[in-house]
Design a protein with these regions (language model features):
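Alpha-helical transmembrane segments of multi-pass inner-membrane proteins
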Residues: 8, 20-25, 39-42, 72, ...
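Loop-to-helix entry and N-terminal half of a specific, functionally important transmembrane alpha helix
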Residues: 16-24, 71, 214-216, 330, ...
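Transmembrane alpha-helices of multi-pass inner-membrane enzymes
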Residues: 18, 41-47, 238, 258, ...
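Transmembrane alpha-helical segments and their membrane-water interfaces
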Residues: 26, 46-55, 79-143, 385
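A membrane-periplasm/extracellular boundary helix in multi-pass inner-membrane enzymes
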Residues: 73, 135, 139, 225, ...
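A conserved mid-to-late transmembrane alpha helix and its immediate loop/hinge
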Residues: 176, 219, 292-295, 301, ...
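Hydrophobic transmembrane alpha-helices and their immediate junctions
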Residues: 208, 250, 343-382
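Long extracytoplasmic/lumenal interhelical loops at the membrane interface
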Residues: 271-272, 277-292, 304-343
């Protein structure tokens, strides 16, 4: 869609959308409740735009939105189906069932982004927020945290007291403002993609320099959080970014930096211990137990599943036979397996369709030069890596962080990576005249 064909937008609506997106960006580093409120507001604004027939979406974005809505609808209905088929004995907890909103959050971000996106504001909020969070994480890593936040924030102080070092030389788990090392580290993977895209693709040296600091801060935060899967995902995403965005000396320099990070991990006693435990965790440990129970649920209810949000009670029903405990029963420690266990083959196919359509739309925009799409595509790669060993939607702040990045990757005016746009095809929304302003 050419930008000249866009209808005039109410300035008040532009301000509302800018406020929602900025609030969402703040939540990426601050608190889960912030991203939940922002995502809910985005869904509401998207519904208003659709009701007013004001949405103008590219065909591939429209397909992604439709797939997201279809998956959300099935998630909403699946507990009732599970009750009717006898696969479940009760309705899921409201907090877990309410996470259906997260499924359409990325689509909502893409929809409201058609009104306009304050790119520099969002970039400044995310970059500044992550630099501050990195500093806080460094302090948490070295000093046993003593200040207890108000109960209203529902932050678990004990998560910051996990010592991965020794009594003589303690190394505590960084949790940033989330006070939770996995929320902190997995959220970093969501935002790492855009930072790498700016670092490798921006034409302005100052922006590349700032993006470089943010990338180093995120890598340091993941290192200090002792998050093994997140570190592996960060390395993979960084290598993909180097292959996509830079060549020659720049690529070699990037590989050297990653090599130094790997060396630091190897020489760290705390990290060596963490990596040694990872092997036992996958082969015969807690993660293998959780996955085996997930597969058992799939075998028992392959088509419709046990109902969205019902993995825990269904898994606990096997406790006497499998030995699963309350902590491990929450999910199958794998996104795809948990989706299959909860929503059956129907939900799995819808979930796969949604991600394939998202990836296709992002790849097309990356090839046409969209900076935001490139960052979102890298973020999508990180999500898929983490999804192999974690059920990321369990932490809404993590899932909604990815959703915001993906939605923005489908929006207009995201800038270009290369100096010129291919002339063989019409200008897409993401690289139209507004993108160069």
């Amino acid at each position: 869609m050419d930008s000249t064909s866009q209808p005039l937008v109410d300035p008040r609506l532009r301000r509302v959308v800018a406020g929602v997106l900025a609030f969402w960006a703040v939540g990426l580093v601050l608190a889960e409740v912030v991203v939940q409120v922002a995502a809910g507001a985005a869904v509401l604004v998207a519904i208003i735009l659709a009701a007013r027939r004001s949405l103008r979406l590219a065909p591939d974005v429209r397909a992604y939105v439709a797939a997201s809505l279809a998956l959300c609808a099935w998630q909403l209905a699946s507990p009732a189906v599970a009750l009717l088929t006898g696969a479940a004995q009760r309705w899921p907890r409201s907090s877990r069932y309410g996470q259906v909103l997260d499924t359409v959050a990325g689509a909502a971000a893409a929809c409201i982004g058609t009104v306009g996106v304050p790119w520099l504001l969002l970039a400044g909020v995310v970059a500044g927020g992550w630099l501050v969070a990195t500093g806080l994480g460094m302090l948490q890593n070295r000093v046993r945290w003593s200040w207890e936040p108000p109960a209203f924030f529902k932050l678990n102080l004990s998560r910051l007291h996990e010592n991965f070092g020794t009594e003589e030389s303690p190394r505590y788990a960084s949790g940033g403002f989330f006070f939770h090392r996995l929320r902190f580290a997995h959220g970093a993977i969501a935002a790492l993609g855009p930072a790498l895209a700016v670092l490798g693709g921006s034409e302005l040296a100052r922006r590349r320099g700032l993006a470089g600091l943010v990338v180093l801060g995120m890598l340091l935060s993941i290192y200090n959080a002792f998050a093994r899967a997140a570190l592996g995902a960060a390395l993979i995403v960084s290598v993909v970014a180097l292959l996509l965005l830079v060549q020659g000396r720049a690529r070699k320099a990037g590989l050297v930096v990653l090599g130094v990070l790997v060396l630091v991990v190897v020489v760290s006693p705390a990290w060596r211990a963490r990596m040694a435990k990872a092997v036992g965790n996958i082969y015969g440990g807690e993660r293998q137990l959780a996955m085996s129970v997930g597969w058992e649920l799939v075998r028992e209810h392959p088509l419709a599943g046990v109902g969205f949000g019902n993995h825990k009670p269904a898994a606990m029903a096997t406790a006497e036979r499998t030995g699963i405990n309350d902590f491990l029963a929450t999910d199958a420690h794998n996104v795809w397996l948990t989706v299959w266990a909860e929503t059956g083959l129907v939900g799995l196919l819808l979930f796969a369709c949604m991600h394939v359509l998202l990836a296709r739309a992002l790849i097309r925009r990356h090839r046409e030069g969209s900076l935001a799409a490139t960052g979102a595509l890298l973020s999508w790669v990180g999500f898929q890596v983490l999804a192999l060993v974690h059920y990321l939607p369990f932490h809404s702040n993590v899932h909604l962080s990815f959703a915001l990045i993906w939605g923005l990757g489908l929006c207009e005016g995201s800038g270009v990576l290369r100096g010129e746009t291919p002339a063989a095809s019409p200008l897409p929304a993401s690289v139209g005249p507004a993108a160069r302003s």
